A protein has these predicted regions:
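Small-residue-enriched hydrophobic alpha-helices in membranes
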Residues: 1-37, 41, 46-160
């Protein structure tokens, strides 16, 4: 309702809608909310997870820093208000094809591996989200292994 009022007032004053505004039906908002959920399921978001979230959203969705922060803010609110994951996964299913959904699962694994470990809550979340997105167990596990391998390689390169 608040969005409708803002849009109405904007139209009356001749103002333009901000091009990076994220509506409730924007799959990027749904994807970001899932990433936020993944990063906070183990208690809180670490600094490395926050940096990874910003980098993932900025690069995958080709956003500038301000739009990325706006997406994080809007998605955090949406995730805090959500009672389940279906709100986000159903939007992603309606919007993205299989390669797009696989990309979301890959982003979530990257988010989960940002702190260097995967706990049982994160693993269960990935199983549930992948299932809701229609991603097979085989693909989910293959993406996990690929991201884990890339994470290990980048950690080894940084230590050298």
């Amino acid at each position: 309702m608040l969005d409708s009022l803002k849009n109405f007032l904007s139209e009356l004053t001749g103002g333009e809608k901000h091009p990076d505004r994220f509506e409730q039906n924007d799959y990027r908002l749904a994807a970001a909310a899932l990433l936020i959920h993944a990063s906070t399921i183990d208690g809180n978001m670490t600094g490395s997870e926050r940096e990874k979230l910003h980098a993932l959203l900025k690069s995958r969705f080709e956003l500038d820093d301000a739009a990325t922060e706006e997406l994080i803010d809007v998605s955090t609110l949406a995730e805090n208000e959500a009672v389940d994951l279906y709100r986000f996964t159903s939007l992603i299913n309606r919007t993205l094809d299989e390669p797009g959904r696989l990309g979301i699962v890959e982003m979530m694994w990257e988010m989960i591996f940002a702190d260097g470990r995967v706990n049982e809550f994160e693993d269960n979340l990935m199983w549930r989200v992948a299932d809701l997105l229609g991603v097979s167990s085989r693909d989910r596990i293959a993406l996990r292994r690929r991201v884990a391998g890339e994470t290990a390689e980048s950690s080894g390169a940084q230590e050298s």
